[in-house]
Amino acid sequence: MHLTIHNAHNGLTTSIQKPIRYHSYQSFKEYIVESFTNYILDDANNVFLLTQFGMRVDFNIINELNDIYFFDKRLFVNENPASILKDYATQTMRDIPPPKHPSLAPYSRGLNIRQMSSSLRSNAGWSMSVKVDAALADEQVRAYKRQISVMFRCLSIMFEFIASFTSDIENSFTKFYNHINQLSLKTLHEHWKSHYKTLASRPQFTFKNGKSVRLADMLNYDALVEASQFVERNLSTVIDQFNQLSATINEVNKSKIDIDGEIQVLRDESIAEFASLKASESLVEDIKSIGTAISTEIDSIASSESRVLGDIYTKHVESSKKLDEKYVQLYNDLTKLDQFKDKLAEKGTALFRHCARLQMQMVNVKLALNEFDSRKQEGKQRSAMQKVQEIKKKEEYLSLTIDLPLLFGFAIIEMRRQYEWYDFFASGAVSNVTEQLQVIINQERVFRKIWAKKIGSFLSILDSLPSDLSQTLPSLDVTVVKGREDFFGKFWIHDIQREDIDKYIKWVGSIDAGKHANFSMLLERNFEDLIKSTNAMKSVTKAIGTLSSYTSPENIDAVQPNDKKEDQDLIQGYKNRIRKLENLLHQQQFKDLSTWPVIKGATQDQSIIFNPKRNSGVGSDNVLVHSQHDAKILLQNHRSSIKDESSSRTDHLKLAKENEDLRKRLQELQIGGERRVEAKVPFEASLSGTKILAQQNTEILAQKKALEMKVDSQLQVIEKIQKESSEKDNEIFALKKQIQDLTGEANEFYARNEELKKNAEVKYDHLVQELNEEKDKSSSLSSELDAMKRGANDRKDAEKAIAELTSVASDLYGKLVDHSHITFDYVLTLSYILEKMGLMLTNEEGKNNVFKIRRVKGLRSRKQDGENSQTDVGSPVPGAIKNMMVWSHTDINVNPADMIESAKEIINVCRNKMDETFDKYNQVVAFRSNVSIEQVSEHDIRTIEFFSNAVVKRFKDVEGLAKKLAKEKKTYETQLQKLTRKMSAKVTLSNFQTNDLVLFLPTRLETKEPQEVIQPWTAFNIGTPHYFLKSQPSVEREWIVARIVSIVEHTVTATNKNDTSLNPYRLSEGITWFSVEAKEVSQ
């Protein structure tokens, strides 16, 4: 059994033998950093491991896992991961040589045998190298396929992890959100007054004993007002907070959909782009078969003639071209896979960072939810959940305006029930128990007296027993403690009768018949429960009355055999039902497990679909068999002719000649068979093309049928259009009739128009007369107009002066606004400087108009971490001052056409808006009379300055802190020197460095060769072997203690393994050893 580790960033996998023998999770991570990533990671804390179900790895059950997936945490936060991805890519990179085209020139008659044989042999060497390169490329293609599959699997696993993480937080948020939503839906802080008025309008209810109750008097009106105000202040804030969290969660869910879509796009792209890679195995097989054929034919070219060698040369030229084309195709597929893998690594890293951002958003949501969980709050501050609980209490108090009749009914029913229960308990159960127990004691006393009379006299003779046996029995004292008024206290109403409860239920039903008709029904059910409770107490009292009667177990078994059988049947039925429920539970658990996301692993299918070499061999065998069959027939004919005409010498010569012809024909048939083999390849290609054409033909026929169906549908549409056109023709005919009718009406209209013209001419004459009269009036008005113009000139001069004054006032107002903004910028800058120094400008407690500079711990570090701009300050004072500048947001529009209105606007702004707000703004910005200053010293003149006083005080605090830190530094340096001197006298056992004190011991080399070697002195160590002393001490010494002067690192390689000068200690290849130069320390 092995544990497989998958790298999410390059698809690399490794296996570890189980059980895992690491003692801690940290050591297991360090192993991954060391062996799996080759120290691309510098810290084991950056290792992030997940299981195949998207869960964090639990080291306690790691031996039960089969696969874990490794992620580099740095890629989740690094915005420029190119260098890290490059390091991971080099782990899986393998140098595959690019295609080298064949150097075999086309055949020409000028080539001699020597040139052709030399070219063919060099071409054979090229084909062998192509075969080797193709095998390497095919192996790399398979590796890339597995690695890309692992990377896709890791993307899905990370998505499952983020989905699970967000869903858990979302579920907890939903519980809180539903609770808050119910509060917002059922709030009564706006409508409680109407319900209170309805409650106050109810009449008093009078009990049977004469006592009356008015329900509205039980509520405190001031408390109701305070509750509504509290809910109004705080409920909207809580709802806004949860709406913001809900928007964040919706955004996260949308981002999850986007991530899932991007992963699916990458999968579709890989499927579409690498659908043709399935034929890579056939390419490799073709390359092998072609290369093998070239190498096989090269062995026979030494004995070949010039003509046969030319045919082989021509054949090798064509084969080399095919071999080169197939290797180029294989190399291009490899290049595409490499490029897609790099693209997938970059896109996957971007998706990992996106997942990390979603996780941080949900962590913020979780932190916000923790504020509403009272179990996770510390300190004495009131948590947000306590505020919600208080809102709920206030809402419950407001709900009493509706539910008080029902609650009061429940209360009086419970009072009566407790009264009856107490009555039965005290007078019935307790008194009966006392009587029955006393009867039992009396029976025991009588039994003991009878027994003592019969047996006791004999036993009294024995010395070991007392002469007088004790006849005392335990005493009995059953009393009732506490009364029945403790629970309700002052709310207790004495002498509540069942008639009162029945009357109250009818009273509630008659009043609340419209809004709360179910109140009376609920009260009736509760009243029935009271009756059941009292009847149960009656049964208990009756059962207590039979305590003194005794029934033996035998009689019970005899009396109730049927009851036992029924109980056993009932128990057996329950057992069967429990078994069925357990089976259903196991089925549901299996169903849940089967619905978990299962990601398929990389396929390991490397089977060969077909073997072109075998097919080509079969074809060539058929041709050769056919040619051999023809040759056999000819030889048989030749033999028969020899038998028939063996006597004739001339015939013998003819047969010899004929035999020679048959040999030539046989050679021609063999050459023809080889040519048929070569011709079969394009024939198979044409056959596959024919199949493709046939498939295309079927598709065309299907398209033809679809087009015919489409034509039929179009014909139906045309018929429909023709019907509609005939209907349109009928409508046109009807419209023509309407046009004829309208022309008749138009003729009548023209006749009326002539009459109207005549009337208009008459009216025109009257208008001419009136026009003459108006001309006379206009002459008189023109004279009046001249007088008005003279007055207008004087007015223009005055308006010009007003316009100049208005523009000057507008400019002054603008400059005043600019100066106010500059002053506010100074305040903002001073606040920013103070916060950079750890101070904050705030309002004094209880005085909003008095300002104070106070020290705030952690403010400076937060500012440095956040890198906020100068305008982003934490002090509320600049915001309050900015709110005072409301008057500065009022723009004065100077209208050149109406300067009087502009002047009125300026006056209105300056008097109505600036008088109060501007003076208040000036008083606040001055920081003179409205500040609280803490003096630095009694005689310091800077105490009258507000900001400089705080800065000076802060600098003095920093100066005092610097002195304190300098003093602590000197103390720590002294302690460091002491520890250094102390540690320099201790022997080092691991991680040797210069100036370490080391114990060296002599060792010996185990070698079979009888030669003199240097006796090694190695450092006594723990987990740090191969540290040898450079200088050889005296042979008689058994140990030495020396201080390291220098350490030189050496590595045993294949070249220096047997060199005694470079490997004097006969170490194995690949071992790193260190030559230590040390100075002996005297005792």
UniProtKB/Swiss-Prot annotation:
How it assembles, according to the record, is: Homodimer.
What superkingdom does the record give? Eukaryota
> Where in or outside the cell is it found?
Preautophagosomal structure membrane; Vacuole membrane
State the encoding gene: ATG11
Q: Name one Pfam family in it.
A: ATG11
Task: Kindly list any coiled-coil regions of this protein.
Answer: 562-591, 648-812, 953-988
GO molecular function terms noted in the UniProt entry: molecular adaptor activity; protein kinase binding
Family matches, as InterPro entries:
ATG11 (IPR040040), Atg11_C (IPR019460), ATG17-like_dom (IPR045326)
Name of the protein described by the UniProt record: Autophagy-related protein 11
* Entry similarity comment: Belongs to the ATG11 family.
- Annotated source species: Meyerozyma guilliermondii (strain ATCC 6260 / CBS 566 / DSM 6381 / JCM 1539 / NBRC 10279 / NRRL Y-324)
Keyword annotations: Autophagy, Coiled coil, Membrane, Protein transport, Transport, Vacuole
Recorded GO cellular component terms are: Atg1/ULK1 kinase complex; phagophore assembly site membrane; vacuolar membrane
Keyword Acyltransferase in record: no
Q: Which GO terms describe its biological process?
A: autophagosome assembly; autophagy of mitochondrion; piecemeal microautophagy of the nucleus; protein transport; reticulophagy; ribophagy
- Membrane topology annotation: Peripheral membrane protein
Protein role: Involved in cytoplasm to vacuole transport (Cvt), pexophagy, mitophagy and nucleophagy. Recruits mitochondria for their selective degradation via autophagy (mitophagy) during starvation. Works as scaffold proteins that recruit ATG proteins to the pre-autophagosome (PAS), the site of vesicle/autophagosome formation. Required for the Cvt vesicles completion.
